Amino acid sequence: MSVRLVLAKGREKSLLRRHPWIFSGAVARMEGKASLGETIDIVDHQGKWLARGAYSPASQIRARVWTFDPSESIDIAFFTRRLQQAQKWRDWLAQKDGLNSYRLIAGESDGLPGITIDRFGNFLVLQLLSAGAEYQRAALISALQTLYPECAIYDRSDVAVRKKEGMELTQGPVTGELPPALLPIEEHGMKLLVDIQHGHKTGYYLDQRDSRLATRRYVENKRVLNCFSYTGGFAVSALMGGCSQVVSVDTSQEALDIARQNVELNKLDLSKAEFVRDDVFKLLRTYRDRGEKFDVIVMDPPKFVENKSQLMGACRGYKDINMLAIQLLNEGGVLLTFSCSGLMTSDLFQKIIADAAIDAGRDVQFIEQFRQAADHPVIATYPEGLYLKGFACRVM
């Protein structure tokens, strides 16, 4: 008999709507003992079967659902099916957009909670972010090896959220060769170098692919400021769009060095690209005080909010930095601003930009809205999957 998680009376509604999380407050009791990440059955207070998921006693998310089908076992065949389903959509996208790199598995939205897999050429980069994902590591890797024999697998499960699930951080090769120090990938006509072993996340922000392309329509013969530039994806796209100058700002000299290499790799005019190592908040104030002006500003900061207790502080941070950007824009200039914080809704982010414009003493028009690229889908029953949002704003 399997271990069962019994829900408190009336707490089954979200599961009936196929939401994949069960929070600790919804649990009445456990029937049997389960180890960290082990597969359990989830039942309502009367014992009616609802779902099968992974148990995580150390997390506020007490269980994550693998399947709502009572006949489905969680084994190698299960992961093979899920991977094949996800691959169909990525194959279409890759062919349509000329990609050799994309997000293969987007966690809950691909029916594999706590699992992220990015493909960069013939390297699969794996992040196991939940206890259940870690528990099923061997089955998942076996399925990957069968479906992708040409690919090496590299683990980047060096993410702090694992500690909340009672797990250590892990990183290193799983199968095949080590990735090179910098791996070239292709994106909308650009060649970009990715540091799989030491870069942010899995090495590169694939979720901003379509936003980088959209930037090109605004930049011809314009002076562009690229804030939190990382390895220069927006800068390369701006140069391909015909900008007169792009200034990339980041605190990491290593990232700026790769950004410079990316400009050279694409045979673009390096004299139009400037790379500044500095704190963005500080530099924006310096630019304002000395009267610098730009035609287009890209504002793509790291996540400002990790939990609800940080939300108010994050709102202030987003408002301040966007206010400074708006002050630096010429009349008719365009601000492309983003938030990758899952707790920041699109409506709240839009209000923050409006408040920033008021504080800057400028009017803005919202002219375009952005979200994560199409290889980062959001399943309808899990709206939390929509974490990246952005706006193009015309400053009057």
Curated annotation (Swiss-Prot):
InterPro entries: PUA (IPR002478), PUA-like_sf (IPR015947), PUA_sf (IPR036974), RLMI (IPR023542), RlmI-like_PUA (IPR041532), SAM-dep_methyl-trfase (IPR019614), SAM-dependent_MTases_sf (IPR029063)
Keyword S-adenosyl-L-methionine carried by entry: yes
Origin superkingdom: Bacteria
Domain PUA: 2-81
Keyword annotations from UniProtKB, A to Z: Cytoplasm, Methyltransferase, RNA-binding, rRNA processing, S-adenosyl-L-methionine, Transferase
Catalytic activity: cytidine(1962) in 23S rRNA + S-adenosyl-L-methionine = 5-methylcytidine(1962) in 23S rRNA + S-adenosyl-L-homocysteine + H(+)
Localisation per UniProt entry: Cytoplasm
EC number: 2.1.1.191
GO terms for MF: RNA binding; rRNA (cytosine) methyltransferase activity
One Gene Ontology cellular component: cytoplasm
Pfam families attached to this UniProt entry: Methyltrans_SAM, PUA_3
Protein role: Specifically methylates the cytosine at position 1962 (m5C1962) of 23S rRNA.
Recorded family membership: Belongs to the methyltransferase superfamily. RlmI family.
The protein, known as: Ribosomal RNA large subunit methyltransferase I
Taxonomic classification: Bacteria, Pseudomonadati, Pseudomonadota, Gammaproteobacteria, Enterobacterales
